[in-house]
From Swiss-Prot:
The gene is benA56. One of its GO terms (biological process) is microtubule-based process. InterPro entries: Beta-tubulin_BS (IPR013838), Beta_tubulin (IPR002453), Tub_FtsZ_C (IPR008280), Tubulin (IPR000217), Tubulin/FtsZ-like_C (IPR037103), Tubulin/FtsZ_2-layer-sand-dom (IPR018316), Tubulin/FtsZ_GTPase_sf (IPR036525), Tubulin_C (IPR023123). Tubulin is the major constituent of microtubules, a cylinder consisting of laterally associated linear protofilaments composed of alpha- and beta-tubulin heterodimers. Microtubules grow by the addition of GTP-tubulin dimers to the microtubule end, where a stabilizing cap forms. Below the cap, tubulin dimers are in GDP-bound state, owing to GTPase activity of alpha-tubulin. This is Tubulin beta chain. It comes from Aspergillus oryzae (strain ATCC 42149 / RIB 40). One of its GO terms (cellular component) is cytoplasm. It is found in: Cytoplasm, Cytoskeleton. The keyword Cell division does not apply. It comes from the Eukaryota. One of its GO terms (molecular function) is metal ion binding. GTP binds at Q11, E69, S138, G142, T143, G144, N204, N226.
Amino acid sequence: MREIVHLQTGQCGNQIGAAFWQTISGEHGLDGSGVYNGSSDLQLERMNVYFNEASGNKYVPRAVLVDLEPGTMDAVRAGPFGQLFRPDNFVFGQSGAGNNWAKGHYTEGAELVDQVVDVVRREAEGCDCLQGFQITHSLGGGTGAGMGTLLISKIREEFPDRMMATFSVVPSPKVSDTVVEPYNATLSVHQLVEHSDETFCIDNEALYDICMRTLKLSNPSYGDLNHLVSAVMSGVTTCLRFPGQLNSDLRKLAVNMVPFPRLHFFMVGFAPLTSRGAHSFRAVSVPELTQQMFDPKNMMAASDFRNGRYLTCSAIFRGKVSMKEVEDQMRNIQSKNQTYFVEWIPNNIQTALCSIPPRGLKMSSTFIGNSTSIQELFKRVGDQFTAMFRRKAFLHWYTGEGMDEMEFTEAESNMNDLVSEYQQYQDASISEGEEEYLEEEEPLEHEE
């Protein structure tokens, strides 16, 4: 069956990854050590998308955990689901990348990468029909950004025809974890544009906003944020893991979502999001899910789609949902918000339906949008990059690891190109071709 091999790199990637495995294990009825004690055959039916069956009714995630320092992995191992993972699949160095992209991509990470690729190869050989890879990482640090992108390109070399999806935590507009974040992020985007098939952009600030505004948590922890991300990650692959009336998988998603190969950076959202106290006061219906999932406040990346237009979207519904109702709602959304959808891709919302809802909910929906407004995010990082790079601030950390300034310049211009490509398609309209045609004809009228 269509297996997915999961990689998590760096501190952020490992923490999101751990939350994801917790969510997935719950959905499939596994306890913290991978033993099945679920209630329904449906949970077992396609368990092998993410899990290998070992002896004694134990299931082992197809996950590879990577970091350049042992700290985060020790925490994962000590956590509630630490006994789930195969011990050989923890690959870590001792030195750390110290938020330095060059260390992750060229020096420290490069020493460790072959070891990781061996583990990935072994996982891939254990699959009947490997569908692709998913990787969780952040773009602002050293290991997740530098080594994460190195891994992506190595895996790309070895498995050129398999899907590569990344869940990438992009730098937030106002909150920055490290000063050199703009450098690391720009160098990473430079890699992702070329080597990833679909990148789901998530940022902490947007997640904080959702936690505070919608979930009414007064001081959200990273645990709360990661829980949100894991809900989306689970939603994206739900069709692979449970039966549904309208299936979707990583490849179908990419075919429907990526009109031009470089423009594969998606915004994601999840519904229903309600504060813990308000659960019992709301009935969740398809119109309400649709309303909420197209709400800018629900997007997990800090760019407002009202400033751009959707090239394509995908909506994945879970639970007992009527197909007709979903189609009506989608048509409704499209006709009401015509200005936010490009008119030169006529039916640009893809829907998928899966009959099994997530734990504790009657129905839910996952939203994935390819909006031109994501350029705001790249523009913001690009501006910060330019400000520092003009003065060559902090560059010695990177050149000291053997990087060339040229590479910075290339990454910068690649990101600027990406921004202007998004802008170009945002401004494009159906009638452009026709207008030129009319201009040629006009002079004839005046001669009469």
